[in-house]
C-alpha cells in the first residue's frame, strides 16, 4: 500500500524515542529530523514537510510533553494527530443536491483511470441506494464511450451518450435524461488530456457553467508523486474543485501526494481506488491511514 514505506520509517523513529524514557529537546530535534527525511522520501512536498515539522516540534517541546511520564507516547500522538489533520481530519462526504439529480463532474488527466473510477464510484453509490446515470462527455478518445458503456454494463448502471457531439450539450441532455428516467445522481465522464492545456480547461469551465455541478471531483493517480500536486493545483485554479479521488493507492506509490494535496489546495481527498476490480473503491479516511 502507498503508506507502508512511510509507516515503517515513522515506526522506527518512534521505536527510538520509546527506548529513551525521559526526552530532551535535543532528542525531539533529532527525531524531527528523521521524520522530515521520511516525509521527503515519501514524496511529500517540501513546503508541506517544513510546515508539518514546525507544527509538531512546537507542540512536542512544550512542558506537557517533556515533563510527562510518557513523553515518547505524547510525541507519537502529536505526529499522528498532525498527519491526520494534514489529510483533512475526518472523511469528507459527497454533497447531494436538494433537488435531484445531483450532478458530479469527474475531471482529470488522461491515464489517471477516470472512466473506470467514475463507474466504480457510481457502483459504490448504487450499493448505497442511489440511482446513478453515467454520461459520456469524453468525445475525443476513440474508445472512451465504449469503455464507459462496458463498465456500465458490468455494473448494471445506465450510460447516456450522444457520440462525438458537443460535450456541453451532451452534459445538459444527460441531466434532462436523468430527470425523465428517475436517476437521482449523474456522473459526467469528461475528457482528459495528456497534460494540462487551455482548450481542455476552457471546455471543462463551459460544462461547469452550463450544469452547475454539486461536486467536481479530480481523479489523480497516486503513483505520479509530486506531479499530482501540480495537477491538483492547476485543476483547482481553473475549476475550484470540491474534492479529489486518488487511484492506485494499492500500488507501491510513496503516498506523499495524498499528504500534500489537501495541505496545498485545501480540498479534501474524498475517495480512494484500492485495486483493479470495480468494487475496489472506498471513502478516504485520513484517520485510518
Regions found by a protein language model. Name each.
Residues 112, 140-142, 167-168, 192-196, ...:
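Short, small-residue-enriched loops and turns at beta-alpha junctions
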Residues 172-175, 183, 195, 201-209, ...:
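Conserved phosphate-handling catalytic cores of large alpha/beta enzymes
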Residues 108, 136-139, 191, 219-222, ...:
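Conserved residues at beta->alpha junctions
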Residues 6-137, 144-164, 170-190:
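Primarily NTPase-proximal linker/entry elements flanking Walker-type ATP/GTP-binding cores
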Amino acid at each position: 500500500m502507498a503508506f507502508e514505506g512511510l509507516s515503517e520509517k515513522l515506526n522506527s523513529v518512534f521505536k527510538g524515542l520509546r527506548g529513551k524514557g525521559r526526552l530532551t529537546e535535543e532528542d525531539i530535534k533529532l527525531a524531527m529530523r528523521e521524520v522530515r527525511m521520511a516525509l521527503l522520501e515519501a514524496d511529500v512536498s517540501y513546503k508541506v514537510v517544513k510546515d508539518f515539522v514546525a507544527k509538531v516540534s512546537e507542540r512536542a517541546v512544550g512542558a506537557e510533553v517533556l515533563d510527562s511520564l510518557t513523553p515518547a507516547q505524547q510525541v507519537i500522538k502529536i505526529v499522528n494527530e498532525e498527519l491526520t489533520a494534514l489529510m483533512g481530519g475526518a472523511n469528507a462526504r459527497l454533497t447531494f443536491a436538494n433537488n435531484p439529480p445531483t450532478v458530479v463532474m469527474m475531471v482529470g488527466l488522461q491515464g489517471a483511470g477516470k472512466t473506470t473510477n467514475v463507474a466504480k464510484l457510481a457502483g459504490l453509490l448504487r450499493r448505497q441506494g442511489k440511482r446513478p446515470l453515467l454520461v459520456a462527455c469524453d468525445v475525443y478518445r476513440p474508445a472512451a464511450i465504449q469503455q464507459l458503456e462496458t463498465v456500465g454494463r458490468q455494473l448494471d448502471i445506465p450510460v447516456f451518450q450522444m457520440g462525438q457531439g458537443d460535450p456541453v450539450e451532451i452534459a445538459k441532455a444527460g441531466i434532462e435524461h436523468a430527470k425523465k428516467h428517475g436517476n437521482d445522481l449523474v456522473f459526467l465522464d469528461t475528457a482528459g488530456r495528456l497534460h494540462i492545456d487551455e482548450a481542455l480547461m476552457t471546455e471543462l469551465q463551459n460544462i461547469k457553467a452550463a450544469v452547475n455541478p454539486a461536486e467536481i471531483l479530480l481523479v489523480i493517480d497516486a503513483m505520479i508523486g509530486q506531479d499530482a500536486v501540480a495537477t491538483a493545483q492547476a485543476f483547482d485554479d481553473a475549476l475550484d474543485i470540491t474534492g479529489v479521488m486518488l487511484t492506485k493507492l494499492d500500488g507501491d506509490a510513496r503516498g506523499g501526494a495524498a499528504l500534500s494535496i489537501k495541505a496545498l489546495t485545501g480540498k479534501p481527498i474524498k475517495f480512494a481506488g484500492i485495486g483493479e476490480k470495480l468494487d475496489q473503491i472506498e471513502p478516504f479516511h485520513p484517520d485510518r491511514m
